[in-house]
């Protein structure tokens, strides 16, 4: 079994991604052909469930873009279900400390290395037990990315990086800026300093730093600092802003977004 996304991170090859929030397999397949290295299927803030994640994994599968799935929480039951339908790379939100990072890793591993329940006869991941020796290969194919999104998590970054099985650490600029007192302003100098320091620390520890940033100059800056998986846009934003621009060309009143920063 292989995980092309995990292999790319290990090799130090920067991976450029796009966030998927439309919760739709048709749009997921459309974007899978756009040329991004990875696509994030969002189960935290988008209206996804296990079934809609499954259909998007199926839609993306024929294309080179690699799927990354974000569950709504660091929940072993939800993680088990997502792995069974075929997710190999998970982005676990709001991890605050090393214990929570260890719990995330354990949820992705079969015993004795972890606590993932064995149900491979029912699982797309094992091709319903058609993959020889799946139970002994699956653990090594898992890629666990954890999100640090608060000052507490930042203060615990060194211990999080020491956890075996953590492949990458994703910095959540929207939540981090809010926690630091600068909600809606991830470009504040204090937030940017925290992000840049974290990227350097993560890379120095031999892990892959990641982030979502639609600002092109900042995204490129993070890549220069050593970020290895960077999402540079969101499908809902691309659709909404693109539609507004087109309508405005034909006289429609431009609807100004009140949001700023990351997306």
Swiss-Prot record:
* Enzyme Commission number(s) from the entry: 4.1.2.52
Q: Which residues bind substrate?
A: 147, 174-175
GO CC: one term?
A: cytoplasm
Which top-level group of life is the source organism from?
Answer: Bacteria
Assembly mode: Homohexamer; trimer of dimers.
Q: Any binding details for the cofactor? A: Binds 1 divalent metal cation per subunit.
- Per its record, how is this protein called by name? 4-hydroxy-2-oxo-heptane-1,7-dioate aldolase
Q: Which parts of the sequence bind a divalent metal cation?
A: 149, 175
GO molecular-function term, one example from the UniProt record? 4-hydroxy-2-ketopimelate aldolase activity
First-tier enzyme category under EC: lyase
The record's Gene Ontology biological-process terms are:
4-hydroxyphenylacetate catabolic process; phenylacetate catabolic process
Locate the site labelled Increases basicity of active site His: 84
- Pfam families xrefs: HpcH_HpaI (PF03328)
